[in-house]
Amino acid sequence: MVAPQSVPARVATIGVHDWDLDCFLAALGELEHPVVVDVRQRRGVRGPQYAWANSQRLQRALAAAGIPYRHVRNLAPTTELRQLQYAADDAAGVGKRSRQTLDPGYLAGYIEHILDRFDLSELLASLPDDVTPVLLCVEAQPGACHRSLIAGRLASEHGLDVVHLCP
């Protein structure tokens, strides 16, 4: 008989904005056995101060720190959903980096078209035992990013505690 896969005790989230690489890695290092789960559609970040967060550089830095990485594109918002959020940001007069919350239309669309169609149980089962998955995206504030929706679903459906790592 095969032992059942254990479920992580918690999930963490982290954005890229407002971190530098050293502080980002230090924050991850405070977690027990972190595994970065990149949920970005486009794994590049604009601005020279965030060059470290572009996919290949980030993967090299994580590997050097002994932190596993995986990209789960199916949890990323579609281009259409991202455009919907950008339009809401423009209408509210807020920039992407200063956004505090997600637009209700974006929320509904992300939940219906992405989150409800994704098997989070399968994601959890694919992770090694005793790890802390760390959902990675761009926004500094978790409430301004879809990663908080994923973390919330993991909490409500799988009993994981949620830790938001913020700069």
Model-flagged regions — what are they?
Residues 1-167:
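Residues lining hydrophobic/aromatic ligand-binding pockets adjacent to catalytic sites
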